Amino acid sequence: MAVSSALCIFSLLVLAQAQSELQQPKIELRLAGDKRKHYEGRLEVFYNNEWGTVCDDDFSIEAAHVACRQLGFLGAVAWSPSAKFGQGEGRIWLDNVHCTGRENSLAACPSNGFGVSDCRHSEDVGVICNQKRIPGHRFINIMNNNVETLEERVEEIRIRPISSHLKRIPITEGYVEVKERGKWRQICDEEWTPLNSRVACGMYGFPGEKNYNNKVYRSLSMRKKKNYWGFSVNCTGNEAHVSSCRLGKALEPKRNGTCGRGLPVVVSCVPGRAFAPSSSIGFRKAYRPEQPLVRLRGGANVGEGRVEVLKNGVWGTVCDDNWNLKAATVVCRELGFGSAKEALTGAKLGQGMGPVHMNEVECSGFEKSLTDCYFNNDALGCSHEEDAAVRCNVPAMGFQKRIRLSGGRNPFEGRVEVLAEKNGSLVWGTVCSENWGIIEAMVVCRQLGLGFASHAFQETWYWAGDANADNVVMSGVRCSGTEMSLPQCLHHGKHINCPKGGGRFAAGVSCSDTAPDLVLNAQLVEQTTYLEDRPMYALQCALEENCLSSTARKNDHSSYRRLLRFSSQIHNVGQSDFRPKLGYHAWTWHECHRHYHSMEVFTHYDLLSLNGTKVAEGHKASFCLEDTHCDEGISKRYHCANFGEQGITVGCWDTYRHDIDCQWIDVTDVKPGDYIFQVVINPNYDVAESDYTNNVMKCKCRYDGYRIWTYSCHIGGSRSSDMDEYSGMSNQLNHLR
């Protein structure tokens, strides 16, 4: 009886807490004020469509903890009374706030009530938060706008091409129409401006607009009945979408359907270079950024990624303080896309590396480049956990209509089936799986808009695809990884060659919203490199696992091998955990070292001549993938002890110390000279990652026959001079598959 009473009381308490959370007002918080860091400032509350402040009466460190956690930080370091960060304006929303520190929102703490205060703004409270942010916390800027926009009046907006342009891809020109109460209506162009056209083109993925042949549209409008929408549109030109523009004056269309002296609105957009058709080569085979100073990394789809800028020859990231759609749109247009769909914060698309070049970016939306915007050079306090990212509007190319996944358990997996021309008609068929790998699978998932590839399958007998699509219609597929669609990859064309045929051997994929991203700590490699002369009798296990040069097999046990040793620290800065490709059942047992290898080749270690030829090499099998250490606030998930689960958690790193077997390159046979020391992680693409360009690390080194000097170590793609060098490395790795 006592137990049931206790359970009843506990249930009532849980129910009361849930009801309390549902009843508490929804508020948003922000930090404001001058001369402050991004993690500190005057505490402001957004309530009842108005920003206001918090009085310092009875405020405490517990209340500061609640506020900082609500803002996405791990907690508070301190709080400050008496408007230390300047006096705010408007309402003082909260006074006499009493928190225990366990509340999920400042609104859950007892207070005088919203707007009930006897304070002045000279008593505005400020907080100083822990600089570390809660992993995965999404930051949303709340903006107040009392102006009625199109979003409140229309259901949809489109660009409708004239009949002679219907087959053009992409559609760059046509009538701008809005859907209201289920009917499409044209817009009168009397109040239409080039700024409106700029916004309309941007939302459809185009960076600019141009003039069009007015005579053609005037002639067409004279022959067709018009159905005008009853409002004009007023855009400033920096909106990300026409629906964000203000409604202009109401129009009074005449009975004959005209709008005074005007005509239906027409826009003609200029596509970015990657989407512009060419009579000689068709669409560009792969997306390449048009500007050298800004790039996107870590995104699954074309037009999205972490924003990186080039400064003094080194690529770095942008801190997300004040990051918004205007700044994101400048980036998107600069790279040949349209306006921004999203301005992402909190390293939503993975963490970068190297310096943080820009902070507190403020753009008007009309700048030609992000580097033209105002920004703070001082990124003190910013970390890669705050890397800004974008998702851009891109033109509709129709790629998704020509590919599908069939037979999978969910929409993210299945046999790959493509639409191909055969005997003058379009038919669905399969893709030959010979040499099919994760790079090709990445292109498929991108074409379908399903994110990253998690696996590539060369057998799909367990997925019952469309029986009418069993025939192979594409073979010899080899992708570089940057293509927007599978037909843009190299393939055999009409001359199909697939010895195994389709059916059970058709290519398949599984896709995922997220992917890991491994990056080596180049500085640690540079700091820990040294030479060791080690006797052969202590290297028998290493010899068995092919960690020594082939000449070592000719040596007796009393001879020595010269080893270039170093430590490696491999960070997962992606969006999901890095796991071995194979499960327990497929791991390989190595008797000499008495451990399993979850990946036979996890890293390649190479010493190269200055022209790129290998002069010595090594490799490291993943006998143990685990979370050696993690960032603050992240718990270890993978441990090798007792044959535990293997992997590297997001925000953690695995360390291979210099003093363990095979953590070296055998340089016994190397002559004195200048060389390139190279490490490649996941060289065979056994596990999917969001970015492979940063899997390569290179150092310069000089060997005099006795000593070795290692310097200038850096990750692939981290410097402007790496672009050609590392794209070449990517091609070399492709040939290994």
UniProtKB/Swiss-Prot annotation:
Disulfide bonds: 55-119, 68-129, 99-109, 188-259, 201-269, 235-245, 319-382, 332-392, 363-373, 432-498, 445-511, 479-489, 541-592, 547-662, 624-640, 630-652, 699-713
A GO BP entry: collagen fibril organization
Name the record gives this protein: Lysyl oxidase homolog 2A
Main location: secreted
Entry note: cofactor: Contains 1 lysine tyrosylquinone.
Range of residues in the leader sequence: 1-18
Post-translational modification: The lysine tyrosylquinone cross-link (LTQ) is generated by condensation of the epsilon-amino group of a lysine with a topaquinone produced by oxidation of tyrosine.
Xref: Pfam families: Lysyl_oxidase, SRCR
Record note on disruption phenotype: Morpholino knockdown in the embryo prevents the formation of intersegmental blood vessels. Morpholino knockdown of loxl2a and loxl2b in the embryo results in increased expression of Sox2 in the central nervous system, particularly in the eye, hindbrain and spinal cord. It also leads to impaired neural differentiation with morphological defects in the brain where the anterior brain is rounder than normal and the eyes present a flatter curvature. Embryo development is also compromised.
Residues recorded with modification 2',4',5'-topaquinone: 656
SRCR domain segment(s): 29-130, 159-270, 294-393, 403-512
Cofactor(s) the record lists: Cu cation; lysine tyrosylquinone residue
Keywords for the protein's UniProt record, in alphabetical order: Basement membrane, Calcium, Chromatin regulator, Chromosome, Copper, Disulfide bond, Endoplasmic reticulum, Extracellular matrix, Glycoprotein, LTQ, Metal-binding, Nucleus, Oxidoreductase, Repeat, Repressor, Secreted, Signal, TPQ, Transcription, Transcription regulation
MF term (GO), any: calcium ion binding
Function field: Mediates the post-translational oxidative deamination of lysine residues on target proteins leading to the formation of deaminated lysine (allysine). Acts as a transcription corepressor and specifically mediates deamination of trimethylated 'Lys-4' of histone H3 (H3K4me3), a specific tag for epigenetic transcriptional activation. Shows no activity against histone H3 when it is trimethylated on 'Lys-9' (H3K9me3) or 'Lys-27' (H3K27me3) or when 'Lys-4' is monomethylated (H3K4me1) or dimethylated (H3K4me2).
Family: Belongs to the lysyl oxidase family.
Gene from which this protein is expressed: loxl2a
Covalent link location (Lysine tyrosylquinone (Lys-Tyr)): 620-656
Broad EC category: oxidoreductase
GO cellular component, one term: extracellular space
Catalytic activity of the protein: L-lysyl-[protein] + O2 + H2O = (S)-2-amino-6-oxohexanoyl-[protein] + H2O2 + NH4(+)
